[in-house]
């Protein structure tokens, strides 16, 4: 009997089971203990294979692939700390709804807690963050193949969002020629190998029913808050709100076209909040709101009803409103709850939104990060997509820009970390094959710098804008102690990215004005390669411009 041969047959069942649940992309890091899984993945023609040497980046690459494909994405890593590096991506997926399947190779039980090399306690290491966790036994023919495949099917068949952790211990030897060991064990699955359906099929979950009193509520004064959603949903939500005559407050990730732009500015005006107090119902479609003023208003508003519609399960309202948590696909929910044509009831807010945008436009000429945020829609590639980083840059775009309705926008706004942003953007581009504009800050770029290796492999032009304001300038917006701000919060690194781009053989530009930036873009969109554009700005200009605009708009 060959241990290595049976390890591979056991792994082949696992990998084949994944294909029955829509897994096409599989991300693989190098490792020895994961050899059975890696070889099984390599031999399965259903998979598109992605590789990376950094497990943390690999997890975020999978996250980006899942964001676009809307299908589960598998990750294979070896044992030890390689597994722990998947934690950030797993946490983000749990909060934003992407499906990740983490196949973590492990030492067999007799090598745990005895000083064996690269052997840690992996079962349960992700605590409550996976939707499902499976600790498989050491491969053995004493366990029927139908148990293995049905165990995988149960976890994936009931997976609506988040991650599944499948821990896979393998004993040595891990290498060797294939023989007939375990062939009959594998063949007991019969024609399942030729089929394309799961061995075990479970009924999908029930979604929220139609709200029978909707015809009553749609005649009231309402407000629509649009959070993270798809491009298709964004266009539908915009039309739905317009028909109802309700003001739409659109987040940067809503893809609604933000018909009332600069919401994070005008929500700081007392006239706007006073008018919003007249709302009898607030319907929030999608979660992960960005703007500080929006979150402050959302926390303080007291309508008769507050409904939150999102296909992610769980509580999504940090303000704990009285109302309804409706678990449903947004587009499907809109069809069940049609709008009735009514006249807009808000008067002040459209005027304030227009005046706020004019105030932003009046400042657009200076070469700075706030102005870039406002102009970002001018640089979007046709038939492309936008990936927005975290920290200050996403807040500036949310507050100062107006993105086109239905234009795809992606971000990691679940846990809102700055780790893995470049890797996620790489996954977004690979899954879509579209021209991609990604924008991050200098610390975010440094944090995931080795992901530039992933950006060497793109199928369409990708432009990475690094806004270099020399540190974490978002802390300039917070009441951090002035005496300790630079050392303990901003942490300026005084670096530039020309040599990093050169090391990975990526094109690089460092424009000094808008004309040079436009020339760099024109050059970048011509070829299916990655271009790094470093925009060096004065440290605090972006934060100061936002604060000045907030003060100006609050007094309109």
From Swiss-Prot:
Annotated cofactor note: Binds 1 thiamine pyrophosphate per subunit.
Provenance organism: Escherichia coli O139:H28 (strain E24377A / ETEC)
Domain of life: Bacteria
Protein name: 2-succinyl-5-enolpyruvyl-6-hydroxy-3-cyclohexene-1-carboxylate synthase
Known catalytic reactions: isochorismate + 2-oxoglutarate + H(+) = 5-enolpyruvoyl-6-hydroxy-2-succinyl-cyclohex-3-ene-1-carboxylate + CO2
Names of the cofactor(s): Mg(2+); Mn(2+); thiamine diphosphate
Entry-linked CDD domains: TPP_PYR_MenD, TPP_SHCHC_synthase
Subunit composition and interactions: Homodimer.
Keywords: Magnesium, Manganese, Menaquinone biosynthesis, Metal-binding, Thiamine pyrophosphate, Transferase
Record's function text: Catalyzes the thiamine diphosphate-dependent decarboxylation of 2-oxoglutarate and the subsequent addition of the resulting succinic semialdehyde-thiamine pyrophosphate anion to isochorismate to yield 2-succinyl-5-enolpyruvyl-6-hydroxy-3-cyclohexene-1-carboxylate (SEPHCHC).
Record GO biological process: menaquinone biosynthetic process
EC number(s) stated in the UniProt entry for this protein: 2.2.1.9
Recorded GO MF terms: 2-succinyl-5-enolpyruvyl-6-hydroxy-3-cyclohexene-1-carboxylic-acid synthase activity; magnesium ion binding; manganese ion binding; thiamine pyrophosphate binding
Family per record: Belongs to the TPP enzyme family. MenD subfamily.
Broad enzyme group: transferase
């Amino acid at each position: 009997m060959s241990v290595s041969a049976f390890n591979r047959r056991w792994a082949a069942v696992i990998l084949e089971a994944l294909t029955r649940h829509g897994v096409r992309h599989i991300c693989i890091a190098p490792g020895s203990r994961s050899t059975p899984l890696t070889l099984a993945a390599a031999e399965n023609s259903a998979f598109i294979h992605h590789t990376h040497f950094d497990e943390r980046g690999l997890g975020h690459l999978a996250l980006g692939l899942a964001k676009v494909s809307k299908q589960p994405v598998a990750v294979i890593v070896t044992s030890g700390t390689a597994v722990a590096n998947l934690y950030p991506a797993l946490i983000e997926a749990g909060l934003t709804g992407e499906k990740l399947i983490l196949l973590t190779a492990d030492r067999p039980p007799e090598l745990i807690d005895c000083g064996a090399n690269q052997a840690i306690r992996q079962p349960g290491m992700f605590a409550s963050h996976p939707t499902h966790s499976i600790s498989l036994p050491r491969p053995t023919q004493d366990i029927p193949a139908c148990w293995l495949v049905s165990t995988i099917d149960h976890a994936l068949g009931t997976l609506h969002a988040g991650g599944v952790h499948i821990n896979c211990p393998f004993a040595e030897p891990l290498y060797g020629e294939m023989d007939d060991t375990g062939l009959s064990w594998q063949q007991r699955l019969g024609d399942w190998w030729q089929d394309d359906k799961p061995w075990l099929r479970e009924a999908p979950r029930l979604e929220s029913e139609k709200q029978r009193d909707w015809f009553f509520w749609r005649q009231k004064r309402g407000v629509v808050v649009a959070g993270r959603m798809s491009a298709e949903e964004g266009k539908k939500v915009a039309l739905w709100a317009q028909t109802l005559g309700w003001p739409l407050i659109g987040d940067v990730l809503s893809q609604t076209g933000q018909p009332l732009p600069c919401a994070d500015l005008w929500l700081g005006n007392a006239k706007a909040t006073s008018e919003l107090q007249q709302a009898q119902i607030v319907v929030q479609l999608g979660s992960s709101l960005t703007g500080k003023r929006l979150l402050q208003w959302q926390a303080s508003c007291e309508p008769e009803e507050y409904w939150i519609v999102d296909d992610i399960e769980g509580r999504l309202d940090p303000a704990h409103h009285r109302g309804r948590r409706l678990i449903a696909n947004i587009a499907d929910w809109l069809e069940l709850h049609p709008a009735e044509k009514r006249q807009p009831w808000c008067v002040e807010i459209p005027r304030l939104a227009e005046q706020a945008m004019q105030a932003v436009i009046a400042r657009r000429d200076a070469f700075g990060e706030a102005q870039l945020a406002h102009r970002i829609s001018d640089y979007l590639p046709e038939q492309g997509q936008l990936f927005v980083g975290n920290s200050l840059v996403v807040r500036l775009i949310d507050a100062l820009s107006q993105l086109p309705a239905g234009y795809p926008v992606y971000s990691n706004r679940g846990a809102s970390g700055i780790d893995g942003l470049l890797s996620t953007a790489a996954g977004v581009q690979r899954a879509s094959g579209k021209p991609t504009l990604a924008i991050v800050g200098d610390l975010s770029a440094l944090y995931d710098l080795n992901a530039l290796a992933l950006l060497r492999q793109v199928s369409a032009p990708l432009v990475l804008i690094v806004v270099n304001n020399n540190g974490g300038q978002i802390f300039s917006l917070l009441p951090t102690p002035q005496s300790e701000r630079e050392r303990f919060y901003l942490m300026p690194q005084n670096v530039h990215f020309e040599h990093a781009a050169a090391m990975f053989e990526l094109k690089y530009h460092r424009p000094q004005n808008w004309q040079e930036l436009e020339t760099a873009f024109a050059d970048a969109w011509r070829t299916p390669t990655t271009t790094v554009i470093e925009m060096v700005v004065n440290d605090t200009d972006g934060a100061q411009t936002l604060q000045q605009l907030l003060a100006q708009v609050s007094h309109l």
